Amino acid sequence: DVVFNNAGYGLAGPFEGATDKQLTDEINTNPLGVLRVTQAFIPQFREKKSGLFITTTSIGGFVTFPYNSVYHATKWALEGWSESMAFELKPFGIGIKTVVPGGIKTDFASRSLQMSEHPAYKEKVQKVLEIFVNPERISKGSTSEQIAEVVYEAATDGKEQLRYIAGADAKAVYAQRLQVGDEVFRAGIEKVFFG
């Protein structure tokens, strides 16, 4: 049996301008939704001595971009939680895995992305948004079918592998961060977005 946690909510914009409702919606959906669903199914899996949890996280759980701090916080939380839970569940024959996509060609931005606003950040946020909505960048994202193939692989390969980096863009960004290190990577991100 497999439980696939795939709900997602994105909050972008300056943290200073985020409303309490925006923060609560982000936290209730991304980490708490996954934790609650998983907790509800653990007893059944434990009794059967088998089962697998798969959670869609994000490359945003390993790298960050400006004006996405709350979204990143929730995705980093899920990655850390999943890694810890793998130890906790393994003695009961239960697996846990994450699928870590980059950009996906869906209507997520129009359907699930919320923006916080604050006048002090308006100009910088606009510059960042122009980069994010650039058609060339969007065209490099994965299709939902490509990500579904990775989910299927995670569900059926029988491996104890924790993470499945999904999509060419996610793999490239993740590899780059590992290769150059945190500070050089962060400096590169800053240059891309702010010159």
What do the PLM-derived regions correspond to, one by one?
Residues 14-15, 22-24:
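Substrate-binding pocket helix/loop in short-chain dehydrogenase/reductase
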Residues 16, 63-69:
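Active-site loop immediately N-terminal to the catalytic Tyr-X3-Lys motif
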Residues 58:
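Residue(s) in the substrate-gating loop at a strand-loop-helix junction
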Residues 91-161:
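SDR active-site lid
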Residues 38, 74:
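Active-site helix of classical SDR
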Residues 6-11:
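Conserved NAD(P)H cofactor-binding loop of Rossmann-fold oxidoreductase domains
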Residues 63, 84-95:
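Active-site-adjacent segment of SDR/Rossmann-fold oxidoreductases
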